From Swiss-Prot:
A Pfam family it matches: Peptidase_M20
GO cellular component: cytoplasm
EC number, UniProt record: 3.5.1.16
Oligomer status and interactors: Homodimer.
Pathway assigned in UniProt: Amino-acid biosynthesis; L-arginine biosynthesis; L-ornithine from N(2)-acetyl-L-ornithine (linear): step 1/1
Family: Belongs to the peptidase M20A family. ArgE subfamily.
UniProt KW Cell inner membrane keyword: no
Binding sites annotated in the UniProt record for Zn(2+) 2: D112, E145, H355
Listed HAMAP family: ArgE
GO biological process, one term: L-arginine biosynthetic process
Superkingdom of this protein's organism: Bacteria
Protein name: Acetylornithine deacetylase
Amino acid sequence: MKNKLPPFIEIYRALIATPSISATEEALDQSNADLITLLADWFKDLGFNVEVQPVPGTRNKFNMLASIGQGAGGLLLAGHTDTVPFDDGRWTRDPFTLTEHDGKLYGLGTADMKGFFAFILDALRDVDVTKLKKPLYILATADEETSMAGARYFAETTALRPDCAIIGEPTSLQPVRAHKGHISNAIRIQGQSGHSSDPARGVNAIELMHDAIGHILQLRDNLKERYHYEAFTVPYPTLNLGHIHGGDASNRICACCELHMDIRPLPGMTLNELNGLLNDALAPVSERWPGRLTVDELHPPIPGYECPPNHQLVEVVEKLLGAKTEVVNYCTEAPFIQTLCPTLVLGPGSINQAHQPDEYLETRFIKPTRELITQVIHHFCWH
């Protein structure tokens, strides 16, 4: 029953007060079970059918799918339930207490992106869900801030095929239809230690890595020359050498050297294609020094993403907002949801607030976000 639903600000307050931090470090990582239970109960009160899905390979994490309405197609509204860890020394407020001050709502997850679920629930007060002609789905995922395991698993296992989807990441209500991907690798060279007084008795891993880096930088130049997408501010795939470590003493031949690097591919570039390009670039080193070079993933890769610019979803949202869709360099769950249906990234709050101390969402987004959610539900589920 709608009258059982708390007021908007109380929903928001309860979401922020329920910790759901995702972290690669086990000591910081938290289950999102309590938050999923909170959301599930509210959507059940609104008449939705709710499914809770354990996400394999995680530390007690869950997805939630709330659905209402019959038939094929419909609209999917999606978001992640987790937040990044917080630096207690840099926050001047309690991260888990929603605080309103000077036109801003402060708290961990206010913008990125627990707040989106408060907007959805609040908008549904004015929607007669018994009259939907197409289904409405609400997806809440786990571990977006680390591995994106929730969205990956949902996309791999669901039979759902909505007409379109909107992911409510903070875009300042500017619709995003494309972003780059992200691939990070560790390049490891195994040499052979020895005393520096006799170089011939060892294999210096730093020298081999120097050779490998030359080929990697050549790949970087080739990516810049071969691939182009004018809409991006950096209109080509980027390759960055981010961290290197090797050796332990100036008088010892270095036995091991490790380089961490990333590539941010354009939409349309496949992960297999990128892996092939990297392996081809490093092939001369591997052939010259068999068995000494390995390439391993640092994190699960994220492909680039693009919603067709002429899709009905793009046209409808651009008309409703009076704004053209954009492309961005950061990553979201959109590549995985896009495998189910055309997807836009669009939500309240600024991406500049994501992962920041004293995170906030400006209250000026409340009314237009509520109106937008109501309008897209009416357009895609009532017509």
